[in-house]
Amino acid sequence: MANLGYWMLVLFVATWSDLGLCKKRPKPGGWNTGGSRYPGQGSPGGNRYPPQGGGWGQPHGGGWGQPHGGGWGQPHGGGWGQPHGGGWGQAGGTHNQWNKPSKPKTNMKHMAGAAAAGAVVGGLGGYMLGSAMSRPLIHFGNDYEDRYYRENMYRYPNQVYYRPVDQYNNQNNFVHDCVNITIKQHTVTTTTKGENLTETDVKMMERVVEQMCITQYERESQAYYQRGSSMVLFSSPPVILLISFLIFLIVG
């Protein structure tokens, strides 16, 4: 990692040094730079005929009475009564636009749903709510329970509550805590709605929530590892020196 950082530093120093020298070199003069211009584009006292390429009474190449190439009575190339090329009554084509489409409205429900996943839930002591998952396909060993699960899986949670993975020593502790708090919250919600959970429901819900907590742990562990790798990369001395040098070149 250190060798890679040093080679990156050498490459960027060489590249930016060459660009810096190119920027400081004076630009060579083009054809007829600084000399007399024809026709009539030199010093203020030069002979201007015809005046800048237009006809009689045409300061900038427009028709009769056209200061900047527009039609009759058009100061800057617009239609009748158009000062800067806009429509009728439009100064520059940017104001007074009729039938302007309204901006699309943001769907507040989508914003609320996106903010809910991964956010700290108030009143639960630092627990976060995970993203919605598809309920896993689980076989319980007999046809009755398998059929019961397929018919009632919608009654079981599809999101789990959890704490950050860095607060646990291993996966088992994370999953155990995740299962307990998720089942507790779902049971309270179900009871509040007036529904009852049977022993079969509790058994199946424990299996379902356990699988989802394992999946949540794998996701959080991977994200935590990636964040740690990024911090290690950007905290290495060669990368810090490289970033400082680039900032110096941009600002300077």
Curated annotation (Swiss-Prot):
Its main location: membrane. InterPro entries: Prion (IPR000817), Prion/Doppel_b-ribbon_dom_sf (IPR036924), Prion/Doppel_prot_b-ribbon_dom (IPR022416), Prion_copper_b_octapeptide (IPR020949), Prion_N (IPR025860). Sequence repeats lie at residues 51-58, 59-66, 67-74, 75-82, 83-90. Cu(2+) 1 binds at residues 60-62. Residues 23-229 are annotated as: Interaction with GRB2, ERI3 and SYN1. SUPFAM superfamilies: Prion-like (SSF54098). It comes from the Eukaryota. Its primary physiological function is unclear. Has cytoprotective activity against internal or environmental stresses. May play a role in neuronal development and synaptic plasticity. May be required for neuronal myelin sheath maintenance. May play a role in iron uptake and iron homeostasis. Soluble oligomers are toxic to cultured neuroblastoma cells and induce apoptosis (in vitro). Association with GPC1 (via its heparan sulfate chains) targets PRNP to lipid rafts. Also provides Cu(2+) or Zn(2+) for the ascorbate-mediated GPC1 deaminase degradation of its heparan sulfate side chains. The normal, monomeric form has a mainly alpha-helical structure. The disease-associated, protease-resistant form forms amyloid fibrils containing a cross-beta spine, formed by a steric zipper of superposed beta-strands. Disease mutations may favor intermolecular contacts via short beta strands, and may thereby trigger oligomerization. Contains an N-terminal region composed of octamer repeats. At low copper concentrations, the sidechains of His residues from three or four repeats contribute to the binding of a single copper ion. Alternatively, a copper ion can be bound by interaction with the sidechain and backbone amide nitrogen of a single His residue. The observed copper binding stoichiometry suggests that two repeat regions cooperate to stabilize the binding of a single copper ion. At higher copper concentrations, each octamer can bind one copper ion by interactions with the His sidechain and Gly backbone atoms. This is Major prion protein. It comes from Ateles paniscus (Black spider monkey). The lineage of its organism: Eukaryota, Metazoa, Chordata, Craniata, Vertebrata. The gene is PRNP.
